[in-house]
Amino acid sequence: TIHGKSAHGMMPQNGINGATYLALFLSQFDFQGNAKTYLDLIAETLHKDFFAEKTGLAYTDPKMGELTMNAGVFSFSKESEDNTIALNIRYPQGVDTDAIKAGLEKLEGPKAVSLSEHGHVPHYVPVNDPMVETLLSVYENQTGLKGHEQIIGGGTFGRLLKRGVAYGAMFPGYVNTMHQANEFTEVEDLYRAAAIYAEAIYELI
């Protein structure tokens, strides 16, 4: 039995991908044809390739950080010629989908590469933007802590606005159970966040 551990798609290095570990185990046996090609690709290239180094897509932006890759959905049948692997790739500014597709097409094994973009192009608002400065000032006033920008690979509603940003609500020492079993937050953190949001709204309007 292989036990995996879930993690947010933007931080695959924090999880344990049971599927790639299974492929790593199975690849030692004498499979042939499509099965061998499929297992070898997963075991030799995708297994623990969180930053797409083995796939040749690795990239780091000075502001937005590293491209991340999570091999998340696998579908294989010995009767099928359409066996698939879905990769969740979070990429910063400086990378585009054409480069990602071209890189994946160079891998040994895949017969075709298709992209589903969901309209999620990289989104960044500079720390010296007046709105961001206001939000950081409110955080500092409410907590007594130094505020700073934080770049994440997760999709947020902030991207719906040209100058939109995600704002909270993870405080220092926060136990991050996001998208995991038994996800929770502390009630006290909810109170602290509500006070910050109230002042932020007041200052922005």
Predicted regions and their residues:
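Long, highly charged amphipathic alpha-helices
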Residues: T20-L24, Q28, A99-K106, T134-S137, ...
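Midchain, well-structured core segments that form catalytic/ion-binding scaffolds
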Residues: T1-G94
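Glycine-rich, charge-dense phosphate/pyrophosphate-binding loop(s)
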Residues: E53-T55, E133-T134, G158
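Conserved active-site and cofactor/substrate-binding residues in soluble primary-metabolism enzymes
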Residues: Q13-L24, E66, V95, A99, ...
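A short small-residue
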Residues: I2-H8, V113-H118, Y174-A181
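Substrate-recognition/cap regions that form aromatic- and gly/pro-loop-enriched pockets
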Residues: F76, N83-G154
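Zn-dependent metallopeptidase/amidohydrolase metal-coordination segment
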Residues: E79, L136-L204
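A common structural junction motif
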Residues: F29-G33, E105-K111, L204
